[in-house]
């Protein structure tokens, strides 16, 4: 999964959720799908955390120049 892209992992996670919600999997199949889903969810979460750390916002100063500031999400 190290070379996998976020979008690919997210699509796989969405498919796993659809299969689990469908209710047609056996218990063993459900557990395997759940384990795979947890791996994809963890990967996606890590990628989102990395992206958030990289986001910078340009702020205009009073003198008209710009400065780069780390992204601070509103919580």
UniProtKB/Swiss-Prot annotation:
SUPFAM superfamilies: XseB-like (SSF116842). Its main location: cytoplasm. Its EC number is 3.1.11.6. Keywords: Cytoplasm, Exonuclease, Hydrolase, Nuclease. InterPro entries: Exonuc_VII_S, Exonuc_VII_ssu_sf. It catalyses: Exonucleolytic cleavage in either 5'- to 3'- or 3'- to 5'-direction to yield nucleoside 5'-phosphates. The keyword ATP-binding does not apply. GO terms for biological process: DNA catabolic process. Pfam families: Exonuc_VII_S. It is found in: Cytoplasm. GO terms for molecular function: exodeoxyribonuclease VII activity. The keyword Nuclease applies. GO terms for cellular component: cytosol; exodeoxyribonuclease VII complex. Coiled coil: none annotated. Bidirectionally degrades single-stranded DNA into large acid-insoluble oligonucleotides, which are then degraded further into small acid-soluble oligonucleotides. Belongs to the XseB family. Heterooligomer composed of large and small subunits. This is Exodeoxyribonuclease 7 small subunit. It comes from Pelobacter propionicus (strain DSM 2379 / NBRC 103807 / OttBd1). The gene is xseB.
